[in-house]
Curated annotation (Swiss-Prot):
Alphabetical UniProt keywords: 2Fe-2S, Electron transport, Iron, Iron-sulfur, Metal-binding, Nitrogen fixation, Transport
SUPFAM superfamilies: 2Fe-2S ferredoxin-like (SSF54292)
Protein's recorded name: Ferredoxin, vegetative
Keyword Metal-binding recorded: yes
Entry's Gene Ontology BP terms: electron transport chain; nitrogen fixation
Organism, as annotated: Trichormus variabilis (strain ATCC 29413 / PCC 7937) (Anabaena variabilis)
Task performed by this protein: Ferredoxins are iron-sulfur proteins that transfer electrons in a wide variety of metabolic reactions. Donates electrons to the nitrogenase 2.
Length: 99
């Protein structure tokens, strides 16, 4: 199993932490295991509570059903069903910016 380094950032919330995330673990689950509090609700990829934005790197969020193609093209992801596919940097708490 491959483990990636995922950097979670948000200047407004003073978040800048890098955590190890196994390829078969969602980024949200890994953050919870590290006692990092991130917003979430459904945990099934069908709402916008845990929306984040990929700054760098690649994730697999093929299980999500909420975001449209345009939003995904802009880098938006839902953390509850996002699995890292490379080392990456992710901006958290992005629900207010989802248009």
């Amino acid at each position: 199993m491959t483990t990636y380094q995922v950097r979670l950032i948000n200047k407004k919330r003073a978040i800048d932490i890098t955590i190890p995330v196994d390829e078969n673990t969602t980024i949200l689950d890994a953050a919870e295991q590290q006692d990092i509090e991130l917003p979430f609700s459904c945990q099934s990829g069908s709402c916008s509570s845990c929306v984040a934005k990929v700054v760098e790197g690649e994730v697999d969020q093929s299980e999500q059903v909420f975001l449209d193609e345009e939003q995904m093209a802009k880098g938006f992801i839902v953390l509850c069903v996002s699995y890292p596919r490379s080392d990456c940097t992710i901006r958290t708490h992005q629900e207010p910016y989802l248009v």
